[in-house]
Swiss-Prot record:
One of its GO terms (molecular function) is DNA binding. Signal peptide: none annotated. It is found in: Host cytoplasm; Host nucleus. This is Protein E6. Belongs to the papillomaviridae E6 protein family. GO terms for biological process: DNA-templated transcription; regulation of DNA-templated transcription; symbiont-mediated perturbation of host apoptosis; symbiont-mediated perturbation of host ubiquitin-like protein modification; symbiont-mediated suppression of host innate immune response; symbiont-mediated suppression of host type I interferon-mediated signaling pathway. SUPFAM superfamilies: E6 C-terminal domain-like. It comes from Mastomys natalensis papillomavirus (isolate African multimammate rat) (MnPV). Forms homodimers. Interacts with ubiquitin-protein ligase UBE3A/E6-AP; this interaction stimulates UBE3A ubiquitin activity. Interacts with host BAK1. Plays a major role in the induction and maintenance of cellular transformation. E6 associates with host UBE3A/E6-AP ubiquitin-protein ligase and modulates its activity. Protects host keratinocytes from apoptosis by mediating the degradation of host BAK1. May also inhibit host immune response. One of its GO terms (cellular component) is host cell nucleus.
Amino acid sequence: MDRTVHSFVERLGIPREDLLLPCTFCSRFLTQEELTAFDFSAFNLVWRGRCAHGICTACARVCASLDLFLHHQNSRPLADVLRDENLTLHGLKARCRVCMKILSVTEKLECAERGESFAKVRGQWRARCRICKPV
């Protein structure tokens, strides 16, 4: 079973524009921009029977918000996270707390520079990406 939109359309031998991928939560078909964002965010396709499903941008944001609200464990500055978890900046896996995109090393540093704490949610670290950062 394919895990990415890219590998799925390659296996099917169809152009990305022809793919109709429903959202797991709202059943709306993802737009071309959302298909790109899906792979960019490193999400995995969900398979129900022989049908693949993704997640639209709106539902990803709602899921991120609910996850943070319902499953927040603690929040700490980046330096504390790296020290306590015995990780390097490259070894720290973190997603955006708003859109769920995987944070780059630069984005992790930008969070620390802004003084933003990293939130532990269901055992995973979250902070804001450069697109979702507070203005």
